[in-house]
Amino acid sequence: RERDCLVSSFNGSLLWEPMSIRKQDGGVYRVFTPYYRKGCLQASAPRYPSSAPERITYADVSHQGHSIEDAGLLPDINWDSEFAKHWKPGEEGAADKLSEFIKHAAKGYQDQRNIPSVRGTSRLSPHLHFGEISPNQVWYALLNAFDDQGSSDLDCFLSELGWREFSYYLLFHFPTI
């Protein structure tokens, strides 16, 4: 606006736009707890996730004449062979991980998340990172899974999503950190 330039944001990877969360005096939060409790939880609820489209059409690029192999992007060493045991990339894999977490670990999360011998975490980080599932989908799936909206397990997990938001918030407002 200051430079007479209109910018629009189409947020698909965060629960709240970093520019929409401000202190009462208009300043920027620097500490997580007030950011999350007074900023996020007092703000409008995260947008409800949209349904998946019935069909996605892609541009035909087969005529371009180059294959992915021609680009030399794949490694010579098969370093990723063990990933398939732990991570199924894509939306389906993300949905499976979320369902598994809700079924087996969400209730008990607050106590089990710090015990390495227990599968007490969601294991959703790579799926969130690569956009295979949105934090909105996770947020509302957890809200729907808990009968008691005051559950300490639910509050604890949602605050973990809040920490993810806070890191993006800080990078947005303080890009040199």
Label the predicted regions.
Residues R1-R47:
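Trp/Phe/Arg-rich N-terminal binding region typifying the photolyase-homology
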Residues G26-V28, P34-I177:
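Glycine/tryptophan-enriched, flexible segments
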